Amino acid sequence: MKKKNKKKLSNSSPKNNINQVDFKGLNDLFENNLNLYNSFVNGAASKNEKPKKSSVKQDFKPKDLYELISPTTDRIFESLNAFNAKIHKDPKLSFENVHIWLEDIVKLNYYFISKASNKKVDPIIKPNIADQRFSSNEWSENLFFDFIKQFYLITTTLLENLVEKGVFEDPKQKEYFKFYIKQVIMALSPSNFVFTNPDILAKTIQEGGQNLIRGYENYRKDNLKHPNKFYISQTKFDDFEIGKNIATTKGKIIYKNNIFELIHYNSDTEKQFEIPLLIIPPFINRYYIMDINEKKSLVKFLVENKINAFLMSWKNPNSDSRDHGFKDYIEDGVMEAIKVACKQSGSPKVNLASYCIGGTLLSMTMAYLKNTKEKNSINSATFFASLVNFENFGDLQMFISEEQISSIEQVMKKVGYFDGRNLAATFNFLRPGDLYWNYVVNNYLLGNEPSSFDVLYWNNDSTNLPEKLYSDYLRSL
């Protein structure tokens, strides 16, 4: 790739000290790389590469993120109106908090002047020790970035306090607004922008902007992989292969129907306990969370310790599965797996272990068996991270409303299922800093490849949900 007007930036320090940036050269460099970026956008990354035709829409617009967070605009406007009404009814609340904010800004300016004069002063505010966005030394040692960081933290504290200390007529409105404020706060973090993140700026200078070119290519690949899902890679998918370095415990499929497949694992011992163990994983992810690798495998531990282990693997629903509901997943899923495990092992009873929504399904199965004349072959039941009481299920309730559910049902009517990638995106925005913006910075701005992480490989290997099942889940639970 040829570069025009390439200039060397003055750099008196091998560590690319940001305090000594040649801003004239930097301006020329970014103008040059903007032209390169536009070449990529237009499909001409190099003279030897012909633009590739694609029916996929490449442009990402702000409304895509907006609709992903909340497909019903009424919800946000209701929250804004409720918050605005609260401020007008209680001007003392805004006055007190804005007064504190102004005091902190004055202190921050004094801090800035004192530090510039080589005086030793303590920062006005520090990030949470668990906040990795500002872990780089430059955020504290470089006065410019230190000021930006503290100004951001002071301002976000103001916003959070206004919401937290406000008394809303409807408590749900407060929770909604807290959620939306969190999304805005994380999105506007100075760590998410080239010129306000010291690590990105240093790398851009050092590499002549090539990190941004690689970052755009990473974005393009993500968008081609999952168009219109605003998907971002969290791990190197090519580094993992089922049966090779993921899900390596030996076993075989002994039963299958249109709901699930049942895996029976090979015994490593001469003798086994009489009662087998049947594992029920969540039906929104793949089965191998219980068998990630040899060092992180519950299944391997079980078979090595004389447990006769069975594991359900839910089939990935398609349009033909639209009418499958909880009754099918109970009768043709869990109950059928219990029967097969008992028959295969010769035991009249089976122990059950469940994870996440697999535990929710197990609790429903147990209630179903208690209220029917069906034979109950459950000896014991264990639940890992399973939600049973849905009275308060945290930030997930931000996505649950009549408008939201109706919108989802309209989408499902067209295809017969809910796309698991949409559900995965929802979970990412429950922890936007760790599961979304962290990867925007690493993949798109620093131009790095994501690291190899087997658990994130599993987390991104999502499955679809049948139309009836998901609709019943949203409305009934």
Predicted regions and their residues:
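Alpha/beta-hydrolase active-site loop
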Residues: 323-344
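Amphipathic alpha-helical
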Residues: 226-237, 459, 463, 467-472, ...
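Amphipathic, low-complexity, repeat-rich surface-exposed segments
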Residues: 1-259, 272-273, 310, 375-376
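Flexible loop/turn segments at secondary-structure boundaries
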Residues: 270-271, 284-288, 317-322, 357-363, ...
